[in-house]
Amino acid sequence: MGWYAIFVMTGKEELVKEEIDRIMSCSETKITYQLIIAKREINERKNGNIRSVIKKLFPGYILLETDNITELYHLIKNCEYLIDILRRGEYFSEIKLEEIANIVYMADDDGVIGNSDIYVENDRIIVTKGPLKNYDGFIKKIDKRKQRITVLFFFNNKEHFIDLSINIIEKFDDKKIGKTIPFFAYRYYQLK
């Protein structure tokens, strides 16, 4: 099974996904596939209030995992609003596993990357809960006012800095808890 990116008209991702599902359910050819419209939950500040909204991670793209890309392409190529499956020359461009792994791991069943709980101690970011808990990558910056963190994703052999939402928790005070927290309980990241 390999991962591919379907290029569609921006804003029509859900329609194309539904159309592909309909075509595949009617098809006699049994092809294993999975479609993900990667999204992120992001905090937006408006008039001093912070509210959470869902935005697409890669507008105009649907992520596709399949075991037979050529056959699937011939079934779906006439979908309205579908532009193409990303290619290199005449061959479909498979997304490297290391590029797609973070996105698939962080996203929930609906393809949404939610909020992470963090606290900042000196020059370290400590992730206590959420999709960033086991993120193994580069963190560019934290915006405490907007409650966002900027992380690096590689997608289609390009670097993408993506803003994700965070909940900033007050700094731990071991004296209040009455016990020490083992070092290995949290993942540490260096601020750059």
Describe the residue ranges of each PLM region:
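Acidic-enriched and Gly/Ser
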Residues: M1-R124, F138, K144-K146, T150-K192
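Residue-level "contact hotspot" at macromolecular interaction interfaces
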Residues: I118, P131-K133
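Short, Lys/Arg- and Gly-enriched loop/turn segments at beta-strand edges
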Residues: K133-I139
